[in-house]
């Protein structure tokens, strides 16, 4: 077959494959748009507008990690889906999978640091916490560790030659390197990543369980203390006149007037509500993170074990391709979680929209 006929055949095959890939391209495009806008807002608000705490810095770093996935990884994925049989670049293939490995490990490290910081603040309030200055040093250190741990991805992935179904026409695609397709290295690599994520997730569940237990104990202790205060206000002693008892209430290390008890109770409730909501936000972020990665690992391990993917004409092809890219949901979901559950983030986001629309109305 001459070159012109080969190019024409590949062009037609590409167009046929494009029709099959349209749902996957649409999914990636939506994730790219929402993830870029949402994580851009997360980075700006949590780094510039929120309190300068270690937690907010970690959230901004996680937003940068997701933003890089949206701006560097997803566009190449869309191009490879559009020209699935004619687009291949060995450099971009290595870069794509290398950046995925870095993002996976770095996201796990940042989410782990957030959980540790929340645990120290809630369960160990009188001990030394992670300061913002220390967090500024921890983020680059985690990036260096992620970079080093991701180096094996360069050898695992690479060029692979596949048959197009037309006699005499083969193409090169980005997949597991031909030298490794029958080896055990890809299986070891993905099992290591999956084991690392599950290990971090297990520690997160233990930490958030301890946090919830500390909050519950704090609430029970507060109720007992307020009950003692109320009993002292209602039951004056024989040595003390009732009028004197109405003027002040005395408990160990605390002296206050009766009308301030309700104010103290409300202040405790507000603080408890804030702590509880903050912990719920980061617990949901951790849960979405691990859930969004599980379909990707399951589909990938199935491919490695069976040493083949899913045929394009199969009914399970589109679900398989969506499962391979399931972790994109983690990059998109976090801004919506903050927007729904974080009042301060929602207010700052509304201010940004007000400024944008106000400028447009001036022109």
Language model segments and positions:
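Extracellular TM2-ECL1-early TM3 structural module of rhodopsin-like
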Residues: 17-29, 54-116, 121-132
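Helix-to-loop junction signature of class
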Residues: 28-32, 68-84, 97, 104-111, ...
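Intracellular effector-coupling site of seven-transmembrane GPCRs
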Residues: 64, 217-292, 296
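Extracellular N-terminal segment of 7TM GPCRs
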Residues: 1-37
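Fourth transmembrane helix
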Residues: 103-113, 120, 127-173, 199-209, ...
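Alpha-helical transmembrane segments of multi-pass membrane proteins
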Residues: 32-35, 61-74, 101, 105, ...
